[in-house]
């Protein structure tokens, strides 16, 4: 699990410039018949449903075959809604009302293989705060090339007063 404590206001501003939003997402999926679960900040396109869920509202997007995508939305942020939802969910699991509380039948949960997070493939957002001088970008891209990391988007934002720059890189999918 990774929270938003390392995200700075500058990252939100940069995301907005890129027509993206930063959202804390919980992701559960079955990959190669193994359970993958993760909570972490994600960049999502501004025009997606999840990007526009805000305030005390939370949403769950279920995507399955052959039904496609379904969205469940309701209050879930803030002390009242969060504690109420948490207690309700815990009681439902304890009473056995939820047959698949973690995406897999309860009686098979212990037998489930867990997908190795180190094998997960996704794109990455990187922000480097550097001195604004020649050769710095070249050093960064050489290191990325060394590890076969391909750049999808690159932006350099100069700070002429401090003689520094922010270099923002969004990669293609990497492992």
Question: Where are the model-predicted features located?
Answer:
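A conserved regulatory-domain signal marking ACT and ACT-like small-molecule sensing domains
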Residues: 85, 90-175
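Helix-enriched interaction subdomains in cytosolic or periplasmic regions
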Residues: 63-64, 69, 73, 78-100
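Conserved active-site and cofactor/substrate-binding residues in soluble primary-metabolism enzymes
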Residues: 2-10, 57, 77, 81-88, ...
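Hydrophobic alpha-helical bundle architecture
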Residues: 50, 72-77, 129-133
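Substrate-binding/catalytic subdomain of NAD(P)-dependent oxidoreductase enzymes
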Residues: 1-52, 57-59
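Low-complexity, glycine/alanine/valine/leucine- and proline-rich hydrophobic stretches
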Residues: 40-65, 76-80, 145, 151-162
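A generic structural motif
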Residues: 27-29, 63-65, 129
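A generic structural signal for well-ordered coil/turn residues at beta-strand boundaries
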Residues: 33, 56-58, 66, 122-124, ...
């Amino acid at each position: 699990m990774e929270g938003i404590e390392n995200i700075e206001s500058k990252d939100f501003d940069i995301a907005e410039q890129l027509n993206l939003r930063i959202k804390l997402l919980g992701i559960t999926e079955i990959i190669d018949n193994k359970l993958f679960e993760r909570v972490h900040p994600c960049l999502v396109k501004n025009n997606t449903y999840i990007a526009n869920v805000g305030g005390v509202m939370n949403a769950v997007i279920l995507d399955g075959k052959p039904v496609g995508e379904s969205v469940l939305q309701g209050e879930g942020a803030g002390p009242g809604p969060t504690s109420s939802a948490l207690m309700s969910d815990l009681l439902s699991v304890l009473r056995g009302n939820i047959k698949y509380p973690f995406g897999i039948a309860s009686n098979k949960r212990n037998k489930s293989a867990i997908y190795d997070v180190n094998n997960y493939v996704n794109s990455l957002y990187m922000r480097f705060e550097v001195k604004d001088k020649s050769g710095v970008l070249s050093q960064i891209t050489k290191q990325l090339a060394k590890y076969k990391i391909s750049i999808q988007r690159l932006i350099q934002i100069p700070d002429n007063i401090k003689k520094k720059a922010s270099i923002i890189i969004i990669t293609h999918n990497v492992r």
